[in-house]
Every structure is written in C-alpha cells, then in structure tokens.
C-alpha cells in the first residue's frame, strides 16, 4: 500500500486507471498524490470546494482499483457468480462516530469489495449531509492547503474553520 500512496496524479501509472480524468478537479485544488486523499477524513474531503460526493466516490474507486488490480472477484460478485456478504452494520459499529472515518479506513477494510466500498461511502456520505459540518450554501475549504491550515489551527485549540 505504501507504494500506491506515493503515486502522483500526473503519472502514467495513475492515468492507466483514471480513464475519466477523475483526478483533474483534485489537482486543481492542490492534491498531488494518492496519499493526499487517503489521509483525510471523508467529511473533510467532502468539504473542499469542487469535490462533491460523486467526484470523491470516483476517486475512491480509482484508488481501490490501484490497490486491487485483479477485478475478477468484483466482476464475479456483480455477475452473481460469487456471494461475498459484507455487513455495513457491523462495519459501522466498529467505526463510530462516522464523522471521524478516514479514506484510509474505508480502503483498508477487511474483505472489501467494490460493492462494499460503495455501500460504506454512501453511508458515510449520508452521515455527512446530516451533520453540522455540512452547509449547503458553501464549502468550508477552497483547497487542500486551506484545509491543512485549518487542521493545524484545530490542533492549536480553535474550532477548525478556515480563517
């Protein structure tokens, strides 16, 4: 996984899996490599301008495909050839509160498959939209740099909002 974290979004290896140029809006707001995304809480990722839940979901799928290049299990599940049950309810119990879930925690879930990834992301996203961290009128952060500054301020005792 460590090698995957260092893959840059402008590298040929990334472009092989990112056929729809999912990384472009991420690059525009300051993301440079996979590690930049994976280290964030999902709630923070969804609070960055131009990163809506669809783009975030597509990014998680691209990273998942880097981590799991063999797609046979996912294709088998999709085609009802393989039955691999995943309990979102059990996962959610282990992860409470959902506001603290990071992208890394989702991607490193035991027995993760593409369907489970989407179910987990949908659940965390639903929790985000019900939370106090969501504001339908504005994003908290205009770019990754602003988010990092806010995180440093939060560690210093402020409320975590960008100044």
Label every model-predicted segment.
Residues 1-136, 140-154:
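Compact, charge-rich alpha-helical regulatory domains located at protein termini
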